[in-house]
């Protein structure tokens, strides 16, 4: 009986782990510092000084298919159009931190 109970418990734990949404082990506070030093000159307050219609506000991120950590990480890493790539300047974990910060701020309307 104990063996069956242990197996059931293990199965539940594995199922929960396998189907839980993948969370970034990101440091939002560090992301805020990195954003301030590297991104705020063009994106202060979630705005976009180069392409005004493509802000970092939640509705614009959703509209342009950028409302996910993966999309933001790809954009910051590789750059696009006027936005430079940060691949050589920031480490992958720093870019993850920035993505977590941007998504958190977007959820709070950058307030």
Swiss-Prot record:
InterPro entries: Cyt_c-like_dom, Cyt_c-like_dom_sf, Cyt_C6, Cyt_C_IC. Monomer. GO terms for biological process: photosynthesis. Residues 1-26 form the signal peptide. It is found in: Cellular thylakoid lumen. Binds 1 heme c group covalently per subunit. The gene is petJ. Functions as an electron carrier between membrane-bound cytochrome b6-f and photosystem I in oxygenic photosynthesis. One of its GO terms (cellular component) is plasma membrane-derived thylakoid lumen. It comes from Trichormus variabilis (strain ATCC 29413 / PCC 7937). This is Cytochrome c6.
